[in-house]
């Protein structure tokens, strides 16, 4: 590998909207996410609709599924 062309690899704090946070390594010192393994329905086993942009309502309106 060539020297001094790669970005610095530092510890990174990942913060979720649910309040969970963990540390990993990345090029960025801080990352904010909407969904993590603590609140994602696949990992929690709960069935809730994750709809960040109103996609479900838009689909129902488009196909008249009220």
From Swiss-Prot:
Keyword Magnesium found: no
Record keyword Cytoplasm present: no
Keyword tags: Metal-binding, Ribonucleoprotein, Ribosomal protein, RNA-binding, rRNA-binding, Zinc
UniProt cofactor note: Binds 1 zinc ion per subunit.
HAMAP family tied to this protein: Ribosomal_bL31_1
Function: Binds the 23S rRNA.
Protein name per Swiss-Prot or TrEMBL: Large ribosomal subunit protein bL31
């Amino acid at each position: 590998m060539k020297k001094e062309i790669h970005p610095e690899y530092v510890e990174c704090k990942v913060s979720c909207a649910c309040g969970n946070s963990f540390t990993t390594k990345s090029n960025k010192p801080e990352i904010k996410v909407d969904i993590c393994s603590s609140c994602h329905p696949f990992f929690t086993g709960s069935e809730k609709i994750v709809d960040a942009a109103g996609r479900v309502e838009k689909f129902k309106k488009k196909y008249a599924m009220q």
